From Swiss-Prot:
Residue(s) at site: Transition state stabilizer: 241
Family (UniProt): Belongs to the pyruvate kinase family.
Protein name: Pyruvate kinase
Gene: PYK1
Species annotation: Lachancea kluyveri (strain ATCC 58438 / CBS 3082 / BCRC 21498 / NBRC 1685 / JCM 7257 / NCYC 543 / NRRL Y-12651) (Yeast)
EC numbers: 2.7.1.40
Superkingdom, taxonomy of origin: Eukaryota
Reaction catalysis annotation: pyruvate + ATP = phosphoenolpyruvate + ADP + H(+)
Length: 501
């Protein structure tokens, strides 16, 4: 019987020739927004391009989309996915008088106001807050963080419907347009701002494959986003960003309606005590794994590589431990958007993930997932789990899945096989968003459908085998496990075979 301790004592620390199964998401910015650099990033291991809609014009984001698609023409390789990260509803301070910064000492008492007359007249006496309900939801003694926690204030008194009296807990500067966090306070901001709605419509029009939805607090927030995406955006995957206490508290209900989750540790580490973040990360990832929904670990993973060619040892451990926790994807932000070493950062992340994957006790992980998954499962999930079990018993080298929607590869990925999941599909969108699922290597089969179903199945299987050989996953004589349907259409994946290449 496999034990975690025994597995780790035999751990191989060389990367070897194995294929990395954890996907890498990279934020595209001025340093990387050109086809040639995008090709280099993809060769280094990038699978999903992220556009941060907190910054940039539509013209700029259109250029990212165009350059991403141009990079596929220059280097076909594997399909590239495009993600739109919403700005989300947020709370900010106003503009300081004459746009100057006002230094304040510790224990400095001042006023926070929602009165619009202070919106462009903030100083060290009064600071404007653009959240109109702040005086209704916050209580005396609560903490308010400004500028990602650089400044901390304690609420001394809710003076009236427009005014809070506060005291600074540390020295700092009152600056313009800084973000505001209210840890431990339930806020009632809308799921989407008008800007977010416009951004989502832009994304649908331009064929993005997934949306990273910021500051999700409730399941209803997800349903609101789905409504805005509309019929034209019905295939866009919604990945919720959990970055506040409300999102953590309501996670089980959110998980039921979302397509996936991002553990967004930046704002989360401000909204909840920083020492709790790693435990919340493990808990949320485990719940996603059990639900069979993809999960992304993000924020400051290799942040020092924004300016340095090598990461800190703690950063490398952070990436590796996210993989061990069960993350399907790991994400880079400033490292690739504005950093001096974007290709190095992707390379280091890819190498770290590959070694971490070798530290996973796959059989024990599979057993846990099978034992804790509620029964009965769907026919497709039963076949998916059986395929992974067959890999262990037959010592197979790959699983080849013929899929239309990407749902079967997702369920195979849930059970964390130690081999590649080769997805063959005629659906380019499904191929691209399937990068969200750990271990899935998607390939688009462009040949016409054959009139005889069995011949069409064999043609697609042979295509999958050829691609697996091309990418170094298979060689002659290897054993493979295959999944396909008994008939054309969606939802028929019920046939499992064990074959020799």
């Amino acid at each position: 019987m496999e034990s975690r301790l025994g597995w780790l004592t035999e751990l191989q620390t060389e990367t070897g020739a194995n294929l990395r199964r954890t996907s890498i998401i990279g934020t595209i910015g001025p340093k990387t927004n050109n086809p040639e650099t995008l090709v280099a990033l993809r060769k280094a291991g990038l699978n999903i391009v992220r556009m941060n809609f907190s910054h940039g014009s539509y013209e700029y984001h259109q250029s990212v989309i165009d350059n991403a698609r141009k990079s596929e023409e220059l280097y076909p390789g594997r399909p590239l996915a495009i993600a739109l990260d919403t700005k989300g509803p947020e709370i900010r301070t106003g503009t300081t008088t004459n746009e100057v910064d006002y230094p304040i000492p510790p224990n400095h008492e001042m006023i926070f106001s929602i009165d619009d007359k202070y919106a462009k007249a903030c100083d060290d006496k009064v600071m404007y807050i653009d959240y109109k309900n702040i005086t209704k939801v916050i209580e005396k003694g609560k903490i308010i963080y400004v500028d990602d926690g650089v400044l901390s204030f304690e609420v001394l008194e809710v003076v009236d419907e427009q005014t809070l009296k506060v005291k600074s807990l540390n020295a700092g500067k009152i600056c313009s347009h800084k973000g505001v966090n209210l840890p431990g306070t339930d806020v009632d901001l809308p799921a989407l701002s008008e800007k977010d709605k416009s951004d989502l419509r832009f994304g649908v029009k331009n064929g993005v494959h997934m949306v990273f939805a910021s500051f999700i607090r409730t399941a209803q927030d997800v349903l609101t986003i789905r409504e805005v995406l509309g019929e034209d955006g019905k295939d866009v995957k919604i990945i919720v960003k959990i970055e506040n206490q409300q999102g953590v508290n309501n996670f089980d209900e959110i998980l039921k309606v979302t397509d996936g989750v991002m553990v967004a540790r930046g704002d989360l580490g401000i909204e909840i005590p920083a020492p709790q973040v790693f435990a919340v990360q493990k808990k949320l990832i485990a719940k996603c794994n059990l639900a069979g929904k993809p999960v992304i670990c993000a924020t400051q993973m290799l942040e020092s590589m924004t300016y340095n060619p090598r990461p800190t040892r703690a950063e490398v451990s952070d990436v590796g431990n996210a993989v061990l926790d069960g993350a399907d994807c790991v994400m880079l932000s400033g490292e690739t958007a504005k950093g001096n070493y974007p290709i190095n950062a992707v390379t280091i992340m890819a190498e770290t993930a590959l070694i971490a994957e070798q530290a996973i006790p796959y059989v024990a992980t599979y057993d846990d997932l099978r034992n804790f998954t509620p029964k009965p499962t769907s026919t497709t999930e039963t076949i998916a789990a059986a395929a992974v079990s067959s890999v262990f018993e037959q010592k197979a080298k790959a699983i080849i899945v013929l899929s239309t929607t990407g749902d079967t590869p997702r369920l195979v990925s849930k059970y964390k096989p130690n081999v590649p999941i080769v997805m063959v599909t005629r659906n380019p969108r499904a191929a691209r968003f399937s990068h969200l699922y750990r271990g899935v290597f998607p390939f688009v089969y462009e040949s016409d459908t054959e009139s005889e179903w069995t011949k069409d199945v064999e043609s697609r299987l042979n295509f999958g085998i050829a691609k697996a050989k091309e990418f170094g996953m298979l060689k002659e004589g290897d054993t493979i496990v295959t999944i396909q349907g008994f008939a054309a259409g969606v939802g028929h994946s019920n046939t499992l075979r064990v074959l020799t290449v």
